[in-house]
From Swiss-Prot:
Primary gene name: TPC1
The entry's keywords: Membrane, Mitochondrion, Mitochondrion inner membrane, Repeat, Transmembrane, Transmembrane helix, Transport
Entry membrane topology: Multi-pass membrane protein
Main location: mitochondrion
Keyword check for Electron transport: no
Family: Belongs to the mitochondrial carrier (TC 2.A.29) family.
Organism field: Meyerozyma guilliermondii (strain ATCC 6260 / CBS 566 / DSM 6381 / JCM 1539 / NBRC 10279 / NRRL Y-324) (Yeast)
Function: Mitochondrial transporter that mediates uptake of thiamine pyrophosphate (ThPP) into mitochondria.
Protein name according to UniProt: Mitochondrial thiamine pyrophosphate carrier 1
GO terms under biological process: transmembrane transport
SUPFAM superfamilies, alphabetized: Mitochondrial carrier
Gene Ontology CC terms: mitochondrial inner membrane
PROSITE patterns linked: SOLCAR
Amino acid sequence: MATPREDHLKKGATASVYHTLVAGSVSGAVARAVTAPLDTVKIRLQLSNKSLGAHDGLRQTVVRIFKNEGIRAFWKGNVPAEIMYILYGATQFTSYSMFSKALTELETTYGFNLRPSNHSLIVGTSAGLTSLIVTYPFDLLRTRLAANSERHFLSMTAVIKQVRASGGLAGLYMGAKPTLLSLGLNSGLMFWTYEIAREVSAQYKDNIPFIEGFCGFFAGASSKGITFPLDTLRKRMQMRSSKTSIIGLARTILRREGLFGFYKGFGISLIKTAPTSAVSLFVYEVVLNGM
């Protein structure tokens, strides 16, 4: 009989900070490498203010990028994105492990006991917010580089200078407010649904290969469906040179593009995010189990 794989994200699990740092970094880098072209297309769709159907918008965007900018254009913004994914993966999983241990100690000290799914929701949200603070400037740089529709590539240095000229160093955090809601909530929901999926599928783990990947796919798809409108607001705000209120921007999108405007790029985002979560969580578990 096969030896059960350890779930390193479960409540009370123990793993060294070094191991979670390495595993989180590797999982982030691999996930980004797999989904980079999808991310570029998603960003272009989210920034479009044209009223196109989902299918037409996706097809036209892919064709336009390939025809006007070349195949390499699908990896525009990849350098800051790789840095962001590595840092985000390392910070997210490391802080998740640390917050999980701390919360477990609080439960023991004060005599209360959270359900594993609620434990994961609290810890996952905290880990997501921590990761956001560390990586957000790279997310903004990634968005601006990927949005460049010219055939030539902009450099990170040039974009940083543009941002500093218009908004100072604080400009690197333009759009952070909806991101606080989006990424924090998304991370919490992802870990929460992942643990629920793990509990439900526990009886099949010896018979179904890559069960962590299936659970991660479900977790990523569920969390993204709830938080995607906030992600669209974030992308729009990242491209602006002046401060814009979340409510004001949301009203503008609703008035000009309708409710669909908040979900532009959602289809490809789902294609991208679910595999990203699946690859990230699966690689994380594989690396830790191999260390």
